[in-house]
């Protein structure tokens, strides 16, 4: 099965910049919101299509957003690169919230949580055991003062704890990665995989994960 990994941090903390040391063919970037990288690179970047990549216009926003998730799953499956980065993955939740803001009731929040969770689960179920998918995701401060994965409020948090869907969660701050919870974040990683504080070099992280689990390079 493939491996989803969460990279979380505030805007400008160095999440996307951590991709800089990858070369073309080593990683592909699926961008939810932006269309460019913050450095010169020949890394392949594709943007999630506003129409979900379907031929017929979706009948409603719920269907449209499911199509976007399906498109992302297809891109991951078809990618020849051993590593994938979903940049600004929190906007999958945010954009769907705004798309469906006119809908009443709580069911839409359950559906939003399910869409995001199902994407993570689909990666876990992919047959390619050498593929790693990084979710580059913004953070927010919780009621205890810790940095947590940004969602769209308590109604979704009651349905889904995003960090719980990942075995590896790295917290990015001031262009460094923190690999374990130190009281200020919900970071976590397997014992002995990383030092507590490491440079925000996702290429080096990728190599460490592959060595730890005995994964190939695709």
Q: What positions do the PLM features span?
A:
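Conserved nucleotide-binding/hydrolysis micro-motifs of P-loop NTPases
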Residues: 24, 33-37, 89-91, 139-143, ...
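P-loop NTPase motor core
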Residues: 83-160
